[in-house]
Amino acid sequence: MALPLILVPAGCSTGGSKQVRRPGIAPRLSAVQEEQTRQCLANLAGTGVMFERLPDRSYGGGCSAIGAVKLIDIGVPVSNLGAMTCGLASNFSAWARYGATPAARQILGGELIKIETFGTYNCRPIAGSARLSEHGRANAVDISAFLLADGRRIDIRNGWNSSDEKVREFLRIVRASACKRFRTVLSPDYNAAHHDHLHFDNGGRGGYCR
């Protein structure tokens, strides 16, 4: 595992303006939370994923990046990844490896060479709400497109209701795979705010897949 670096988390490019806040001292974790984070980091390292442990940060307004990592190599390149909670990073890595990659091969007949995202951390409320988004806790990631070795780029905006049956099937399969790993998964079927991306997060009570 690489030595930790102090990095400012990347913001998400959709669903609200990005707020720049100076990092402060994060609240102290309980012994249980510290043990959960330690175990998560050990499990993530055991999968062969390369990552950097980030320092805990509080950005004010309820926004924070606690128990977070920056993924370096999960087996397929991913754009725009900033701070992610360890649990989110673990689930995302597994989804990319065991969900998206084989789905591209089996359904589209191509090798997945890149996953494009709109980012992870972004201190903002949920679109149309005053409630803080899970992005504000580094606990969400938005997927925008998939790039294949043959040059095809499958993006959510144009692919979700594509005339190509295989493209539609692929995107719904990767959503279904995500629903097995994340507490909340939102797609263009949820609302217009998600017309161009798949939102995955580990917040709330879980069990919401749309």
Could you tell me what each predicted segment is?
Residues G15-K18, G60, I66-A68, L132-R210:
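Catalytic cores and adjacent binding grooves of peptidoglycan-active enzymes
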Residues Q36-I115:
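Active-site acidic/histidine clusters and adjacent loop/turn architecture
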Residues I25-A31, G82-N91, S129-A130, I156-E165:
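Second-shell loop/turn segments in exported
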Residues Q106-A138:
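Active-site-adjacent substructure of cysteine-protease-like catalytic cores
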Residues V8-G11:
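C-terminal motif of bacterial Sec signal peptides marking the signal peptidase cleavage site
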Residues S13, Q39-L41, G62-S64, T85-G87, ...:
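Sequence contexts marking disulfide-bonded cysteines in secreted/extracellular proteins
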Residues V20-G46:
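Post-signal peptide N-terminal segment of mature Sec-exported envelope proteins
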